[in-house]
Amino acid sequence: MKPIQTSQPVGLSRFTLIVGTLIAAAFGVGSAMAATAEPLEAKVTELFSKDLPECPGKEGLMITVEYPPGSVDPIHRHPGHGFIYVLEGSIIMQVRGGQEVTLTPGQTFYEGPNDVHVVGRNASQTKPAKFVVFWVKDKGVPVFIPTK
């Protein structure tokens, strides 16, 4: 029985794969590829919260959200009114029934308490994005509620 002929010897392709993997690991490319396969989650930092006695059951909350490159939010909603201001990078937002918008530093976006946020992501695969959100929301309810 004759061996199967290929355009490249099998031994060479294995060698190339092994050397390529070692080089990628040495230079951190493997971790960058892993980050691309599963985007990192957004980092949310609470800046300030305050009960709103004039609005019973409501509180004001200010947060920053940092999207790593390629970060994507799951579909969700928020229990209040959100006023978004982009600080750096570029983000893409859309609520159900609305148009997808790309926002850059200095631009704003609004989400209402009945909106389902169907798109929330970093527009870049290589640069981070950061925005601040001021919420007027139901007191004691998480600001992020996963939904379908």
Segments (PLM) and residue ranges:
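Ligand-binding loop in jelly-roll beta-barrel domains
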Residues: 100, 114-141
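Short proline/glycine- and basic residue-enriched helix-capping loop/turn segments at helix->loop/beta transitions
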Residues: 62-66
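Extracytoplasmic low-complexity repetitive segments enriched in small/polar residues
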Residues: 50, 69, 92, 108, ...
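Histidine-centered metal-chelating micro-motifs
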Residues: 72-74, 92, 109, 113-122, ...
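Short acidic-glycine-tyrosine-enriched beta hairpin
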Residues: 67, 97-114
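Glycine- and acidic-residue-biased ligand/ion/polar-headgroup-sensing regions
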Residues: 78-97, 107
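A short, N-terminal "cap"/entry segment at the start of jelly-roll beta-barrel domains
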Residues: 2-61, 128, 142-148
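A short beta-loop-beta micro-motif enriched in histidine and acidic residues
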Residues: 58, 70-85
